[in-house]
Amino acid sequence: VTDDATRTLGKGSAPPGPVPEGLIRLYSMRFCPYAHRTRLVLQAKGIRHEVININLRNKPEWYFTKHPFGKIPVLENSKCQLIYESVIACEYLDDAYPGRKLYPCDSYERARQKMLLDLFYKILGYQNTVFFGGDCISMIDYLFWPWFERLDVYGIADCVNHTPALRLWIAAMKQDPTVCALLIDKNIFLGFLNLYFQNNPDAFDYGLGC
């Protein structure tokens, strides 16, 4: 597994070579919540992968051959097959790779998790379970988590004070080894946002060495 904290590739950069056999490549950006979803699933399932970070203010010309609109995340395997859209990419990883399954095997429970995307805060309180999928972390928890991790960065962590079930869920998620492995320091995140809102292309490499 390669380090996610690599410098971005931008306009004028050479395209990466073929994906090595036995690996899957993730085109990502360290601060993107949608790419964060995919990184969580890769980490949770222990999938061997490499990360190519893309400068979203200064996208490489070649990247539009990976995604027609230049968006992230994108997965690419050694057969040059491309998978994009974060929920689809996460589902692909769960289906294509062995080991821990993050989506339930039961068809109804699988469908129910997908329906929760629009009803999450109501369902969690109603179910009386720690996690959205039950008593153990599952795919739906990882799909939600990136936005909740960012609440403190945006200065709105108190927006969940009136929802005890959500507060318990956030506390439980912060104990998960996968979540802990991908946490970004708040000050680094704030530094990124400061440069990002100045339209500074160096924002995407904030906090990395030269």
Name every feature range the model reports, one short phrase each:
Residues 108, 112-184:
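GST-like fold's C-terminal all-alpha helical module
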Residues 11, 77, 184-185, 195:
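Generic detector of low-complexity/intrinsically disordered segments
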Residues 1-128, 136, 200, 207-210:
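GST-like domain detector, emphasizing the conserved glutathione-binding G-site
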Residues 188-210:
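C-terminal helix/juxtamembrane-tail motif
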Residues 64, 154, 159, 194-195:
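A generic membrane alpha-helix/interface feature
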Residues 59, 165, 186-191:
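Short amphipathic alpha-helical segments embedded in low-complexity Lys/Glu-rich regions
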